[in-house]
Every structure is written in C-alpha cells, then in structure tokens.
Amino acid sequence: MTEFNWTFAVGGLSLSLAGPAAWVEPFARAWASWADESLGWVVRLVQDETLPAPQKPFFGARPRFVDGRCLLEVPGFAGEIAPEDETARLRAHPAAEPGDLAYFVRTAFALQAFDADTLLFHAAGVVHRDAAYALFGHSGSGKTTASRLSSGKPVLSDDLVLLRPSVSGWEVWATPFGRQRASQQVRSAPLRALLRLVQAPEERLEPMPRAAALGELAANSPVINADPVRSAALLARWDGVLRSVPVYFLHFRKSNAFWEVIDAQLG
Amino acid sequence: MPNLDDILSVAPGVISRESDGELVVVLPEQGKFVVLNGTGAEVFQLLDGQRSLSEIAVVLSERYEVPLEQAQTDVLALARKLLDRGAVRVSSE
C-alpha cells in the first residue's frame, strides 16, 4: 500500500498527515491552499481490517481522557492522541469515510491549538471593515446562514475558527474545517467582537452577560471542554478573551441587514 | 430527589470560575455549563462533601436573615437542578 505524507498549517500551527495515499491525498487536494512544510504534530492514519465495519460516523465519538492521552473509540475506529508526544494515531476500518478521518484530524488539531495557547472555536468568522466577527451559537443557530448572508465579505470559516493571541489582541484565523470554503485571500483579522446568534424577527445587538458568555464559549470549544485537566485553563483563557473584546447577542433575520446594526453600534 | 439529610459534592471533572459576581460551572463530560448567581454560587461552594443540605440551609438562613424554611426550599431546589445536570453527586445520606 502506498504511503503518503502531507503537511498543512493553520494559524502557524503545522500538522503532518501520514498514511495510505488513498486516505491522505484527498486532504492534500481539498486543503491544497493550506499546504506547509514546517515540522509539527504528526497524525498517522492506519487501515485496520481487524476492526469491525463502522456502524455510525466517527463524529459521534466523545473524546475520553486517560493518563494525559485523548481516546476516541467507537466500532470501526480506535484513535489515540498523545499531546505530550505531539502525535496522534487513528486505526480505522478501510470503509472509513473522509469525513471520519477529518474528524480525527480536527480533534488532534484542537488539542494542538490549545497547547499552543490558542483556541479552536465553534464559530463562523466573517471579516468586515478589516476586523473579524466571531458568530457563535448552538448547532442550528445560523452560523452557516449568517456566513452566506454576508455576501462580499471574506469568510474565514462557517464552522470552526482559530483564535490566536497577538501583541495587539486576539486574532481570528481561518481553518479548512468548515463546510463553506474559506476565503483564500484573507486568512486572519483582529477580533472585533463575539456575537451569539439568535434568530429573531428583527436585527439588534444586546450585551451578553459575561458569565453566560463564558459558559457558552467553553461549551463551544470542541474537545478541550471534555478534558477535565484542561477545562480550568480553558475557562481562564476565555475569561482573558472576554476582557479584551465585547460579546453580544446578535438577533438577526435571514437577511444581511444585521451588518448595518453592527456598524451602527460597533463600527 | 434530594432531601435535607443528603450530603452533596461536586462531580468529578466539574470545574467552575467566578465571573462578574456569578459562577460558571462547566461539565466537561457533557460539554455543558450552568451559571449560578450570588446565592447559588455560595451554595455550590458549600457542597463540599462534608455538610448536609440542612446544614447549608442554616448557613444561608443566618447569613441572609431569611426564614430557615425558605432557605431549605431554595437549597433543595438548587440541589435538584445541579443533580439533574450532573454537576454534583450525593456523597452519603
């Protein structure tokens, strides 16, 4: 079986994929604009026919933390991420789908990002007037819809963005993990505000209480919020973000008029 | 359903952080959270696996000068909410 290695980088964090060409090459094609040559974490993908055929998508596997390692195990998949070694290994039945493999890569990246003092955040990132707005909320709250309604504005991701600290504050970085293709021209922008999406009959911004925001932001931090060891640091990191940028409920209809409200209040 | 003789403690892995006078309690296993206001936060911090709910109600009753019966009702309601969410567990009865 032909082995293939390919490296990509998000927000300066590199991750190398190693495994059968049939599994790694699709990543290299789909995420070609993220290719990189730096040394970073290594994710090894291994086909294992002795595992039972997958019954459900790997996405349903909850991370479990044991002795500093993150385990993701459901029938057809046995994943282990070792942050201390900066490696991850997924044994998967040959019938695994590309989405299953991407889920494991994303999980490893979430840990890599957190241990590098950044945050992988379940949010859409949209750039408006050279600043990024992170739109978050529960599944179905409208992240993809709001991204699509933001015509003409660079979309960093419609699902997962990377928050990275810089000397001038927090930055939002694009990732390849969303459903909608991220902007190729704009890959990052300074974070202007966090906006909790609420579908409503009118557009308006409403300040969000910080404690509620802290809880929701932690809940929207994939993988890390399941790790008892990292959870306290996760809250502290989000608390730091909330001290530097405002957070609002963004009530919005299915139109792009919400940007006028944002301009009026935050512009 | 908790009763006043129960002794509750924070469930393993649950973490909390104070923010603007409120307490955010995060349940890593579920990826969920609970926000508690001032009194709720105080009760949560008294759930140390040592004191019964009855003893905690006495503390609140004296601290806030409210009738003991009222404090007991409030403590039981919060305990029920926290047990339902998996944020605490019964240590002993």
What is each PLM-predicted segment?
Chain A
Residues 141-143:
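Conserved glycine(s) of the Walker
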Residues 146:
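Hydrophobic positions on the alpha1 helix immediately C-terminal to the Walker A/P-loop
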